[in-house]
């Protein structure tokens, strides 16, 4: 339908009692887990809580959906898929924290690997050793440097802004991302970290939930 989610939320926000909930990856130690306590007890009592379970199915498959749309953008722009370097910004379960528990960014990472791409994750908020131990993902030391301090030497085919850390907007504006990417710059901006109009005006390929 080509309806922009942010525009819908802004319009709905003109109602005084509107509660704003944005689409994204639902991870962490509570929201992504606690509903199952309720559904388990409900089913023991003979009730099938379809609405809650449907919501969890959608959330649990969001990483796959984002990865698939990233691949579609590579195809649409004529970029390679096999061996494509893809940068993922952020791995904590939400913005501006260090907590990596039940991060759904890992779902994007694994799905991209299934397409034989080379996903790289950078998150200055996360503890490298914990991410390595928990998810077997070696975080970049910088957006162009591998965990072994070896330059990647190849630009990224796409960049996924997975977590809306303030530091990403401050340290990595669009012109910086353009410098490390093949043309056109593909930005998969899950929670709207960057300005959509600015991206499109600069000829970038932009997609968000």
Report residues per predicted region:
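Structural/interface elements that position substrates and couple domains in central-metabolism enzymes
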Residues: 1-209
